[in-house]
């Protein structure tokens, strides 16, 4: 769910969108569908109520290393590409594309453009997709965005992708700028993103992230069962809900814990980075 800078409520946004986008074909270039459900996932689930969505799994931001994690991901990508387009949820179809994750070379970009276009168009033909609306969350998809017969191209930016660890920042930045200039609309989720993207496209708007109100308000319902390991913690509880990755400001979390020593600071979510400094703080859980 979301709130806009115009003061429109999230309920009216959903109603308006479902009314405008009915019976349409939608492309979505994002992270892997099997990964954690992010804002893109929730948005496409809403749109899939009245439309069909072809979700194109992640096109890599960076060249893989010889690490165990990267090799495992590469093998999983190869195996997934051998499977046909599947429908994990009603009206949501998932394609596992193959591409060479190296964007500094013009030759590689040209190869990816042709190969990815062929893969996506083949999936579109099999599903009978026509005049799609293309929601691009992954700037690496710039290599084919706008070349798929789209009626509208939308770049939906929720992160400063060029600052991710291990990314070929300059090459990805070039792809992103080209994508923004070609897009009919650029949507950003934060003020800082608006400041950095609006110069590349006059049709840039800010739509901040929101939450599923009905889901989270259950925390105030006395009938909601609190897990035992949380129930026994000292009150109040200061919660962090989400992925704990290397872009999370650990210093701020540590300062919050130090400023409220009587409270319990609870981090709920998958951890993919070193949190040993936080683990040494007594009231961080």
Model region roles, listed by residue range:
Residues 2-77, 258-260:
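N-terminal subdomain of nucleotide-sugar transferases
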Residues 274-285:
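Nucleotide-activated donor-binding/catalytic signature segment of Leloir-type glycosyltransferases, i.e.
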Residues 229-248, 254, 265-268:
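Conserved donor-binding/catalytic core segment of Leloir-type glycosyltransferases
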Residues 17-21, 220-237:
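Nucleotide-sugar donor-binding and catalytic loop/hinge architecture
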Residues 192, 207-222:
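Carbohydrate-associated surface elements
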Residues 142-143, 157-169:
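A short, histidine- and acid-enriched strand-loop-helix "catalytic/donor-clamping" loop
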């Amino acid at each position: 769910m979301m709130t806009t800078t115009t003061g429109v409520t999230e309920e009216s946004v959903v109603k308006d969108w479902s009314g405008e986008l009915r019976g349409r074909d939608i492309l979505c270039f994002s992270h892997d569908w099997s990964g954690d459900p992010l804002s893109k996932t929730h948005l496409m689930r809403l749109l899939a109520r009245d439309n069909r969505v072809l979700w194109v799994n992640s096109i890599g931001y960076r060249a893989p290393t010889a690490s165990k994690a990267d090799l495992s991901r590469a093998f999983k990508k190869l195996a997934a590409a051998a499977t046909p387009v599947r429908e994990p949820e009603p009206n949501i179809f998932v394609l596992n594309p193959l591409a060479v994750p190296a964007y500094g070379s013009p030759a590689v970009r040209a190869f990816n453009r042709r190969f990815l276009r062929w893969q996506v168009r083949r999936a579109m033909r099999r599903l009978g997709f026509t005049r799609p609306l293309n929601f691009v969350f992954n700037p690496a998809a710039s290599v084919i965005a706008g070349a798929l017969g789209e009626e509208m191209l939308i770049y939906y930016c929720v992160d400063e992708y060029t600052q991710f660890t291990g990314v070929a920042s300059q090459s990805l930045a070039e792809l992103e700028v080209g994508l923004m200039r070609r897009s009919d609309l650029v949507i950003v989720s934060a003020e800082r993103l608006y400041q950095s993207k609006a110069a590349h496209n006059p049709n840039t708007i800010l739509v901040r992230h929101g939450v599923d109100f009905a889901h989270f308000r259950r925390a105030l319902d006395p009938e909601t069962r609190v897990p035992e390991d949380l129930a026994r913690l000292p009150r109040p509880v200061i919660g962090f809900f989400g992925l704990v990755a290397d872009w999370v400001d650990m210093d701020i979390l540590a300062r919050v814990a130090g400023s409220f020593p009587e409270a319990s600071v609870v981090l709920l979510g998958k951890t993919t980075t070193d949190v040993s400094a936080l683990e040494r703080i007594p009231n961080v859980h």
